[in-house]
């Protein structure tokens, strides 16, 4: 499912020279690249993987900003200090509630996919994109692992006829190949401690929401 025209990036280029807008008003996308094949890619800054995943999913630097996601945190739980939906030091680390609420503001919804199922049941033609939530090992510097884990958000999408991993930790988007290759990639991810969310465009799917259009007909309840 291709992006609606309002959600595509035009000819603007990201700034690849800085570390993001430190005043919290920008998207925090200091490490951004427009790839030669026209794919927009934000790279990791601080713990803003949720922000980068959303902007990479929608292919634009201004779809969401750090300040906007911070506002969503206080909308969901009206307090700034020790807000449960983000890092207490204000570096991001947004939880699933913020990601789902952000998608709703763009007329999309996130559907959790049961990882016990085979992803070959998915009706890829009606799915706008995918968000993966994966474990992330924390370390002190590059060498000393810390005894706790965090979670990392990343986006997956079909662009220019192929599926791509738009993980902000990658130097550039990674082509995952054809539909069949992508489904095999998802199957591998789901065998690990990874959570998959399907992103659906409510503007086109609202009439058939109860019919589980994200599944092929033979797999619907």
Curated annotation (Swiss-Prot):
Its EC number is 3.4.19.12. GO terms for molecular function: cysteine-type deubiquitinase activity. This is Josephin-like protein. The keyword Lipoprotein does not apply. May act as a deubiquitinating enzyme. It comes from Drosophila melanogaster. The active site is at 49 (nucleophile), 152 (proton acceptor). It is an enzyme of class 3 (hydrolase). Residues 1-37 are annotated as: Disordered. The keyword Coiled coil does not apply. One of its GO terms (biological process) is proteolysis. Transmembrane segments: none annotated. Residues 9-20 have a biased composition (Low complexity). Residues 36-214 form the Josephin domain. Keywords: Hydrolase, Protease, Ubl conjugation pathway. It catalyses: Thiol-dependent hydrolysis of ester, thioester, amide, peptide and isopeptide bonds formed by the C-terminal Gly of ubiquitin (a 76-residue protein attached to proteins as an intracellular targeting signal).
């Amino acid at each position: 499912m291709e992006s609606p025209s309002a959600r595509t990036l035009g000819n603007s280029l990201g700034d690849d020279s800085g570390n993001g807008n430190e005043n919290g008003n920008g998207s925090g996308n200091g490490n951004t690249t427009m790839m030669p094949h026209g794919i927009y890619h934000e790279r990791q800054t601080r713990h803003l993987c949720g922000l980068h995943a959303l902007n990479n999913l929608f292919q634009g630097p201004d779809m969401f900003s750090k300040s906007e996601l911070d506002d969503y945190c206080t909308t969901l739980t009206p307090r700034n200090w020790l807000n449960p939906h983000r890092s207490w030091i204000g570096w991001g680390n947004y939880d699933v509630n913020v990601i789902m609420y952000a998608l709703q503001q763009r007329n999309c919804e996130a559907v959790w996919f049961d990882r016990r199922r085979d992803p070959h049941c998915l009706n890829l033609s009606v799915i706008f994109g995918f968000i993966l939530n994966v474990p992330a090992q924390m370390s002190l510097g590059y060498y000393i692992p810390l005894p706790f884990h965090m979670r990392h958000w990343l986006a997956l999408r079909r662009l220019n006829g192929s599926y791509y991993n738009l993980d902000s930790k990658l130097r550039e988007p990674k082509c995952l190949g054809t539909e069949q290759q992508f489904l095999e990639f998802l199957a591998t991810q789901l065998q690990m401690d990874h959570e998959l969310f399907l992103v659906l465009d409510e503007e086109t799917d609202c009439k058939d929401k109860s019919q589980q259009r994200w599944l092929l007909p033979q797999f619907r309840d």
